[in-house]
Amino acid sequence: MGSGSSSYRPKAIYLDIDGRIQKVIFSKYCNSSDIMDLFCIATGLPRNTTISLLTTDDAMVSIDPTMPANSERTPYKVRPVAIKQLSAGVEDKRTTSRGQSAERPLRDRRVVGLEQPRREGAFESGQVEPRPREPQGCYQEGQRIPPEREELIQSVLAQVAEQFSRAFKINELKAEVANHLAVLEKRVELEGLKVVEIEKCKSDIKKMREELAARSSRTNCPCKYSFLDNHKKLTPRRDVPTYPKYLLSPETIEALRKPTFDVWLWEPNEMLSCLEHMYHDLGLVRDFSINPVTLRRWLFCVHDNYRNNPFHNFRHCFCVAQMMYSMVWLCSLQEKFSQTDILILMTAAICHDLDHPGYNNTYQINARTELAVRYNDISPLENHHCAVAFQILAEPECNIFSNIPPDGFKQIRQGMITLILATDMARHAEIMDSFKEKMENFDYSNEEHMTLLKMILIKCCDISNEVRPMEVAEPWVDCLLEEYFMQSDREKSEGLPVAPFMDRDKVTKATAQIGFIKFVLIPMFETVTKLFPMVEEIMLQPLWESRDRYEELKRIDDAMKELQKKTDSLTSGATEKSRERSRDVKNSEGDCA
């Protein structure tokens, strides 16, 4: 969400006044007359003098609030406009001493009291300097106005100028106050939206301090690193979470049900509200008697227990949950599964990467972290995600299953554990083989078949970024590579094995995606299409297009590399020939000597 304060920024105009640069600042609330008076004051001309602005190439500039801004290098030149007083048949009410009617032509004359010394160069060639004007029937040409009359006129003009000045200052003050109030209101709104982010940062700092303290106090431990703090207690907020409840528009509600939903447009508060809406929309709050306040506390605590990793963060959690929600509607899963299964699918999707440290299972095992030791090298991260999920649910304030009978909770717990453990990509081939075997005679009434289908569904959602439009999917690739490179850099520094697809010196965006799309994503979604044909157009077609796009990108990269090699070869060859010529010249000079 943007600041919004830039719309209230005043405009600055630079004027060239006899070779001196004068800066004039005004707000968008000034009118053309106000701006012209400011320019007159800046240039030393009387107020209400008609002036024109010229650019450096003598083009005229309109004097109004929307006039184009300039810089000190391109100041505008100010020129007074010479207005020729045309004669008009105005009858003078006063008769001259000779009894004649004063209907003779008017002569141009400067008004007494406003005459200013003429500046050199004030009028360009081709302009007409105003001639002095003689009031009709009052004085003969060459006759001076009496001093008392001149003093009276000057006094009146001074009072009028003072009144105009006060009026302009009041208007400017009002505009400035309104401007500041609007900016302050916008800032208050923005600061309110940052409350959750600030609390999240505080929580992360606290966790880092506790982790550092735990590391420094640990001695003679075979584990190199610890991502756990045994004394950490997940304490949710006792009060109702402070994130605002957004009212989703009908367009947002409709878009939320589709895989094309743009997950990058939403702030954490808005994502929390969207997740809350999903539970209400699917009837889970109603069917399982979930307290709405408890649901909000649970979502807030889940948000707090996702780390700020480049990829495995709360936005990824929302991305997976939203894809699961869209598949429920796309494939009409509520007709195939019970509400308990829908609750398991949605809750497992939200919790599937809780407290992810940003380093995968391979690193955990090779570095002998506390997670790997605790779970005996068997899916250490996925086991940890499950443990954190049920630590949160163990808190009464966050237990969204508190009104479910013990047998029902046991079924939900076992289902969530099964699905979260299935997200370990080391088990991908095993799960796919089992599912393909069941696909030959798939039975929706068979519990084993349905469990495998749920495992495939959460796997599809977990790695479904390329199903989304290119502008939504591509930033996720950059985030994932950044996390991979962080891990490979750490593995290099610690002398651990480095996977080629994580090495910043070997992998590119195209090479990273082509194999994954061709051999993991497309086969898995093709299998799902056999049960749900509607998946082909909505999800499989974007995968084919993504594969073709990255293959084309790889061809371009390869061509550029080949061209670079040829260029380097030619350059090195030319350099070698130049060295040989230099040696030949030196040898010939030596022979001559």
Curated annotation (Swiss-Prot):
The active site is at H312. 3',5'-cyclic GMP binds at H312, N313, F314, R315, H316, D353, D462, Y484, A512, Q513. InterPro entries: HD/PDEase_dom, PDEase, PDEase_catalytic_dom, PDEase_catalytic_dom_sf, PDEase_CS. Changing Y484A: Induces a 6-9 fold change in inhibitory sensitivity by BAY-73-9961. Changing L480A: Induces a 6-9 fold change in inhibitory sensitivity by BAY-73-9961. Induction: Up-regulated in left ventricular hypertrophy from aortic stenosis and following heart failure with preserved ejection fraction (at protein level). Keywords: Cell membrane, Cell projection, cGMP, Cytoplasm, Endoplasmic reticulum, Golgi apparatus, Hydrolase, Magnesium, Membrane, Metal-binding, Phosphoprotein, Zinc. Residues 104-122, 576-593 have a biased composition (Basic and acidic residues). Binds 1 Zn(2+) ion per subunit. Binds 2 divalent metal cations per subunit: site 1 preferentially binds zinc, while site 2 has a preference for magnesium. Tightly binds zinc. Binds 1 Mg(2+) ions per subunit. Binds 2 divalent metal cations per subunit: site 1 preferentially binds zinc, while site 2 has a preference for magnesium. Binds magnesium less tightly than zinc. PDE9A is a potential target for treatment of diseases such as stress-induced heart disease or long-term memory defects. Specific inhibitors, such as BAY-73-6691 or PF-4449613 are promising candidates for clinical tests. N-(4-methoxyphenyl)-N~2~-[1-(2-methylphenyl)-4-oxo-4,5-dihydro-1H-pyrazolo[3,4-d]pyrimidin-6-yl]-L-alaninamide correspond to compound 28. Homodimer. Specifically hydrolyzes the second messenger cGMP, which is a key regulator of many important physiological processes. Highly specific: compared to other members of the cyclic nucleotide phosphodiesterase family, has the highest affinity and selectivity for cGMP. Specifically regulates natriuretic-peptide-dependent cGMP signaling in heart, acting as a regulator of cardiac hypertrophy in myocytes and muscle. Does not regulate nitric oxide-dependent cGMP in heart. This is High affinity cGMP-specific 3',5'-cyclic phosphodiesterase 9A. It comes from Homo sapiens (Human).
